Amino acid sequence: MEPGVRARSGAPQPASPVLWRARPAGGGGASSWLLLDGNSWLLCYGFLYLALYAQVSQSKPCERTGSCFSGRCVNSTCLCDPGWVGDQCQHCQGRFKLTEPSGYLTDGPINYKYKTKCTWLIEGYPNAVLRLRFNHFATECSWDHMYVYDGDSIYAPLVAVLSGLIVPEVRGNETVPEVVTTSGYALLHFFSDAAYNLTGFNIFYSINSCPNNCSGHGKCTTSVSVASQVYCECDKYWKGEACDIPYCKANCGSPDHGYCDLTGEKLCVCNDSWQGPDCSLNVPSTESYWILPNVKPFSPSVGRASHKAVLHGKFMWVIGGYTFNYSSFQMVLNYNLESSIWNVGAVSRGPLQRYGHSLALYQENIFMYGGRMETSDGNVTDELWVFNVRSQSWSTKTPTVLGHSQQYAVEGHSAHIMELDSRDVVMIVIFGYSAIYGYTSSIQEYHISSNTWLVPETKGAIVQGGYGHTSVYDEVTKSIYVHGGYKALPGNKYGLVDDLYKYEVNTRTWTILKESGFARYLHSAVLINGAMLIFGGNTHNDTSLSNGAKCFSADFLAYDIACDEWKTLPKPNLHRDVNRFGHSAVVINGSMYIFGGFSSVLLNDILVYKPPNCKAFRDEELCRNAGPGIKCVWNKNHCESWESGNTNNILRAKCPPKTAATDDRCYRYADCASCTANTNGCQWCDDKKCISASSNCSTSVRNYTKCHIRNEQICNKLTSCKSCSLNLNCQWDQRQQECQALPAHLCGEGWNHVGDACLRINSSRESYDNAKLYCYNLSGNLASLTTSKEVEFVLDEIQKFTQQKVSPWVGLRKINISYWGWEDMSPFTNTSLQWLPGEPNDSGFCAYLERAAVAGLKANPCTSMADGLVCEKPVVSPNQNARPCKKPCSLRTSCANCTSSGMECMWCSSTKRCVDSNAYIISFPYGQCLEWQTATCSPQNCSGLRTCGQCLEQPGCGWCNDPSNTGRGYCIEGSSRGPMKLAGVHNSDVVLDTSLCPKEKNYEWSFIQCPACQCNGHSTCINNNVCEQCKNLTTGRQCQECMPGYYGDPTNGGQCTACTCGGHANVCHLHTGKCFCTTKGIKGDQCQLCDSENRYVGNPLRGTCYYSLLIDYQFTFSLLQEDDRHHTAINFIANPEQSNKNLDISINASNNFNLNITWSVGSTGGTISGEETPIVSKTNIKEYRDSFSYEKFNFRSNPNITFYVYVSNFSWPIKIQIAFSQHNTIMDLVQFFVTFFSCFLSLLLVAAVVWKIKQTCWASRRREQLLRERQQMASRPFASVDVALEVGAEQTDFLRGPLEGAPKPIAIEPCAGNRAAVLTVFLCLPRGSSGAPPPGQSGLAIASALIDISQQKPSDNKDKTSGVRNRKHLSTRQGTCV
């Protein structure tokens, strides 16, 4: 037994008990014994595994506990057994061989690691039956797979591909999936990618044991006829190979309901009025049920997935499909639904095998379109084949593509044939995935009578097409209902959807219906009594974290067409799991028949669903509420099925009231048409937002016919560059990897954007020269129609002129006698446009388009008149990322070409196919790709692998060790028994050929582990695995690398070659030989160039390279990057600029260095030895300064004198500063004073300017302050006061009475606290004898004084206060000036 693999001796005997001893936790206590029968031994292994998992996952490092899962602890480090890796040897990574009669295998006690490749070979004896039980299996769905082969290599028949969560759903352990091989061998290969990892798997195996331990309903017995083989003796009322099928439950209700047939097929035979697997349901019944019919013959070769089935009479015709092995595959099968018998179609010639195609039946013919071909390249086809049921013969159709349509080669699509209201019979092909154009959202129509193909324009909602959806056609509503699929999602993402669309075939209108809430693809759909039944499918939609979604589903959903409602139906209540995807379903007599599919293995069973019968409902209320899964109507005192009624049944359907949609539900629709063409109750608001119809909106649209379709809405649905380029208004952004709409202003008003040009058609009658001038005035020229897009556009536009004849000039004229050319100087090729018969004639040298029965060119004199002209001008794309489309991934045939575009494509090395990254899952839905690459490419054949370790990493390779036993050998395709080769040139089968590694010549074949001695042919081994002495200039533990100073690939006897670096490097790249130059500024693979772009000069072939320094500048060199790691030297040169000044040098560095300085006057200095004269030689310094005298070195007589500085022997990283300078030692007084006064005057001028600015600012602020003060004073309260003046002895007359009392102030302004105030009075100034004031002076003045008012009497205060508050009051007393 191989190390690291757990096994136990002896096969389990189900009938014998097993004793297990359990000890309580803690150091003491009594022991207890648990007695288990043989049916529970797997359960014990599961507990043991979980206990081991918990112990290892919580274990401490090896230095503390010494725990290693598959290895031993040595010096606190785990030394792993072969095939195990990790700090605790907890991950598998290699090959294992198991030879025990039974045992188990696992990826490890914790989650498996990323990029894991593990292989197990279980070896029994020839033709032994080997059973695998997957008691635990959890991997990333559709990405991480376990492959099981019935043999000892991957070239043996494939029997199972496991992925996702394998969880039994029925009665626990007895339904654990079991895989069987019959060759005596089983090869299991596991591969995981780099997305996320799960808990892995725990697989039990046993040789010649009973299937599923007889499911607990039988006894495992040894066969009498064939020794060493066992079989199950089933208990009563159980049958099947594993005793897992119950029969005659409750004795079939005998005798009233039926009886049990114990001698024949062991099933219930019901009386006429009873039905069901146990005859417990009435005929007709108000309940539904599932059954598994007994199929005859039950051949495994029938199993397939992604096939298609149609019903013709009592036969279900099954065509195509995917299978593991096509050697015995039958393209056409039919199943008799009455007798449950399979028949193989007697077809001699026909199409190649394919899957993912579509089938549609019309009369006696079955139309098959598209699909993925099962050939070496695996291309998607656009072939249209017709199979005649009566003659059982194939014929092919080549339809004519109408107009400017495109026939898409698709897979994962669906098709239906119906008769339109126009009496035209048409096959409608819905969606699908095209390897060239990506996920298509188009409808394709094939008109059978005219044999024509068309891609029509559709109305209504803008829908998104995809792969693996299902669709049904309803005769009542004349519509096709499309559900689910794998699609392109917003934000350049891809995944499953739960969308439901309705396509009205006569009006070509899309409507979005209520989604199911359960995303899936590769499911089935049928229509029964007004309900669309959805079964199974792949529901895994996780991307970075597993949420428990299963790859294989048994979900059962029902959609009520009349009420737009979804219901979840109970899953099939059968004796085993029926999870699957990629199956087919048909309807006969109101029952659904499901066939085949994929659930880790290819299924060949048939499931039958019998829905309730409307006739069984006797009450009107029960009839109307029948369901889910069935639609009934009450008609004249009896209940009948939906299909038996007329089209008015929709109006009479009783549906639950629909709740108004919320705004959040409507927000998902980004365009007006999809917002209004759905059943969710939404409206399109004027601010380009979809909201609920119950929400307020100033201007809304509620009918899709009122919507304006914008280019952005169309372009966003195109998922590939090719499909984007087909739309003239879209362009592909290579950086964002999305299709974007071209702005409408690219060409301007009146112009049409067509391809890379703008075209404009004018119907005016002009000569050629005037037409050319007209276009010139519009910044264009007469159109050069060199592309098919431009020709098609012009021809279409000409047809729109119905009121007048338009035969426009185009930019084509005769250059010389025999040469016609376009205005853009391109030659006329007679491909996109052709001359009319008899043209060109000799009468004219200019061409125009003649709209005849067939539009074409006609020559005319350039001075004559033509009816119209076509102008053209270039268009400049605003998106700089828009470039021509790259080659589609599917057309790239090598790994290098496939992975050259970054992450756009993925290369599958096992199938030699390149696929789009966004379509990897649908390109390999059944795990056909064993390994993929997106960046680095590994050798595509075993022969390209040079070491045994690399060889055994690939599951299809083995290593042939040569007789030298030094590790040399060669890698070749093979199995555990020996190497293999192709059986023939045109035969893809491989056969064993031991002569490729002859054992008689002492060659050794290794398939599980490499030979112990792995010295690559450069040394012999001591102690079996230690290389004694590496020769041939090699080094390393296995002599796998070249010695320093040499390069090459010494693996498997390769040679090492000396590095060629011209003395400028000590080492080079070990594999490429590129030299790591030690002098900064020298570059090239062989250090043969100077880095002239960065001011390095010289010739490294004859000397070295120097950095040219400038005088009076300081340079800093930071050798800190990883590219500078090998640099240990840098050189400089400098030439004095002035002949009368000394040359100073200053250099310092962050690390110690050696310094050598030389000088030369010749032009060959630095290249010829002896031309330089040494000046300075220093070692191990960090700083140096010096000055070279111009007199000593005679700068004046040696104008070409050059100084060379060599800095060497420093360590990385380092920072170096160096400067050469020339200046006088005696200060020039004149220059000093000139400089001083210049600076002084400049400073003075700056000070003056600053002072002036300050003064200006101060004056401005002062003016503003005065203005504010005046405004404040002007806003103070004011009043008028009457003043009585005495002039001499005269009294004033205008007062009523004499003045009384003392003079009063004109104002009193109290201060805070009312203890002081400002008193204001009028004063009479001194006057002359005449009574008049002196000239130039005033006779009056206003005086103010601060007075104390705290001692005044209350009466006085009252009077004063009154006087202040009533300033307008006229005093009645005579006043006197004081």
Swiss-Prot record:
User: Which tissues is this chain's protein expressed in?
Assistant: Highly expressed in brain, heart, lung, kidney and liver. In the central nervous system, it is highly expressed in the dentate gyrus, CA1-3 regions of the hippocampus, and the ventral taenia tecta.
Q: What UniProt keywords are attached to this protein's entry?
A: Cell membrane, Disulfide bond, EGF-like domain, Glycoprotein, Kelch repeat, Laminin EGF-like domain, Lectin, Membrane, Repeat, Signal, Transmembrane, Transmembrane helix
Is this entry keyworded Glycoprotein?
yes
Q: Where are the transmembrane segments?
A: 1230-1250
Null mutant phenotype: Mice are grossly normal with no alterations of pigmentation, central nervous system pathology or body weight. In contrast, constitutive expression of Atrnl1 in mice lacking Atrn display normal, agouti-banded hairs and significantly delayed onset of spongiform neurodegeneration, indicating that overexpression of Atrnl1 compensates for loss of Atrn.
SMART domains listed in its UniProt record: CLECT, CUB, EGF, EGF_Lam, PSI
> Which stretches are Extracellular in the membrane topology?
52-1229
Identify one Pfam family in the record.
EGF_LMN_ATRN
The UniProt entry annotates Kelch repeats at: 315-364, 366-414, 426-474, 479-530, 532-590, 591-637
Q: Name one GO molecular function term.
A: carbohydrate binding
Please name the InterPro entries in this protein's record. Answer: Attractin-like_CTLD, Beta-prop_ATRN-MKLN-like, C-type_lectin-like, C-type_lectin-like/link_sf, CTDL_fold, CUB_dom, EGF-like_dom, GBD_ATRN
Q: Residue limits of the CUB domain?
A: 92-208
Query: Which CDD domains does UniProt cross-reference here?
Result: CLECT_attractin_like (cd03597), CUB (cd00041), EGF_Lam (cd00055)
Q: Where is the PSI domain?
A: 613-656, 665-708, 714-759, 888-938, 941-1011
Q: For this UniProt entry, what is the primary localization, expressed as one broad class?
A: membrane
How is this protein positioned relative to the membrane? Single-pass membrane protein
Supply the name of the protein.
Answer: Attractin-like protein 1
